[in-house]
Amino acid sequence: MATGKVVVEKVGGRSTATSCFSKYPLKFLLPSKAAPAGTDVVWIYSITYGGGIVSGDSISCEFTIGDGCTAVITTQSSTKVYKAIGSKCSEQILEARIGSEALLVVIPDPVTCFSTARYYQKQIFRLLSDSNLVLVDWITSGRHANGEKWDFEFYKSINNVYLEDDHPLFLDTVLLEKRSIQSIAERMQDYQAIAMVILFGAKLKEIQKQVQENVKNMMSEQLQLSYSSRRHKSESSSRNRFMKPEFIASCSTFGPEGKGVVVRIASDSTESVYNFLRQQLAELEPVLGQAPYA
């Protein structure tokens, strides 16, 4: 049985949560004033008791977003994954069905794994040809104040998007695992956060165009700065070393007729990722009633 389940349907012409269930360690908050009056959207805050996921916890969520509805799934703070007890793995499974002309926006705060933590996450989205989806999935390096940097044991995040009759549209897996040869921190170098953003659907067409253009311009500037710095260093020192950008983003399309856009990010700070998400998703404010990550 699922740990949590929410159904959003049209009632009297408005998006309404017609069913909401959750049990320990999960809790859903659906504030009625999350968006201004007149905004047709349901905001769903996913919360865990104790502010995090304990070793061995298993959370399973199901969301159904009916035809023409708009819903947001978010969090109040980062999802903390506490230290593992032995080989126990904390896991979180999310499955969502998005109806015709519906929009689901999944904009959580990042996952933060404590030292030795083991975490597995799988998110499955089932869409129709005219469904719309915004998905943000990201992780930080850990608790900086405690001197932890990519110090967890295991992290695996799967995001699968299916179209119509279970036709694979977008399949993605991120795996970070401790190895005896090279640690996660060594492989991640100085980057403190990695993120992925998915934008799919006709309702997001203009935002997709803007994000693609913004990422292109940002990375062009980064390359120019890196080249200038490299040239300056080569003139002043024979031991030239390429300067790694503090923020990297890439953008590509997927799906039929390029209806989907995926953005991948690596940054040396969590705050710069927050800033990027605020800027790129700001155009959603009229639809959602408030700007994501505001």
Swiss-Prot record:
Keywords: Chaperone, Nickel insertion. One of its GO terms (molecular function) is nickel cation binding. One of its GO terms (biological process) is urea catabolic process. One of its GO terms (cellular component) is urease activator complex. Disruption phenotype: No visible phenotype under normal growth conditions, but mutant plants cannot grow on medium with urea as the sole source of nitrogen. URED, UREF and UREG may form a complex that acts as a GTP-hydrolysis-dependent molecular chaperone, activating the urease apoprotein. Belongs to the UreD family. This is Urease accessory protein D.
